[in-house]
């Protein structure tokens, strides 16, 4: 049976080899919450082992974002930092692979004016339009990893102490991502082949509509 450390390493390896498909000489951008430092370091190591030229980091913190939205004026919130947008846009234009490590953000918007929250999202999407366009059109490779938090784990496993709840949530994530397989990377390659075969089969049938 794999240890937690071994599973975490396989999780990081999947992100690099399958999710982002990092190539030799490619730059990599990792966006992650500060609580995920251990995972970020492992992903970074795997990226360099895969031949990454450089790895850049974009750190986030829900509590700091909460404070910003709570205290900043709408005028300030409507002004996205130009340097930050330029940095992200420059990286994707250079073909950087993007690896996002995300949490659920439970409670982040508690007590925040909905108008401010909506304005913040609108401002970000407008400023990062080119960056997101590169990703959504698959002009760069990108992937998303999930990182469990205590708040999320306690929501799912309310009867357990925080440490056990987080451990159980990790196991759910490892199972969903095939990390619990003997060879997770090969398991995903096999899964991709299965999907491709099914797509080919359905396309050859030339179905016009489905009734169910």
Where are these regions (language model features)?
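Active-site bordering "gate/hinge" segments
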Residues: 1-212
């Amino acid at each position: 049976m794999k240890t937690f450390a071994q599973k975490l390493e396989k999780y990081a390896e999947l992100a690099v080899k399958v999710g982002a498909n990092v190539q030799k000489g490619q730059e990599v951008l990792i966006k992650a919450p500060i609580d995920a430092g251990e995972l970020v370091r492992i992903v970074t190591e795997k990226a360099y082992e895969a031949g990454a030229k450089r790895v850049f980091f974009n750190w986030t913190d829900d509590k700091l974002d909460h404070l910003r939205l709570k205290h900043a004026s709408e005028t300030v919130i409507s002004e996205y930092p130009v340097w930050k947008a330029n940095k992200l846009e420059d990286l994707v234009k250079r073909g950087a692979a993007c690896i996002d490590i995300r949490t659920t953000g439970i409670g982040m918007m508690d007590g925040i004016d909905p108008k401010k929250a909506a304005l913040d999202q609108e401002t970000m999407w407008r400023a990062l339009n080119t960056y997101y366009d590169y990703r959504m059109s698959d002009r760069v490779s990108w992937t998303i990893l999930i990182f469990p938090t205590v708040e999320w784990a306690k929501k799912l496993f309310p009867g357990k102490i925080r440490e056990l709840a987080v451990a159980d949530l990790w196991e759910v994530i490892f199972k969903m991502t095939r990390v619990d397989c003997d060879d997770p990377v090969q398991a995903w390659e096999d899964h991709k082949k299965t999907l491709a075969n099914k797509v080919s089969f359905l396309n050859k049938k030339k179905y016009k509509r489905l009734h169910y």
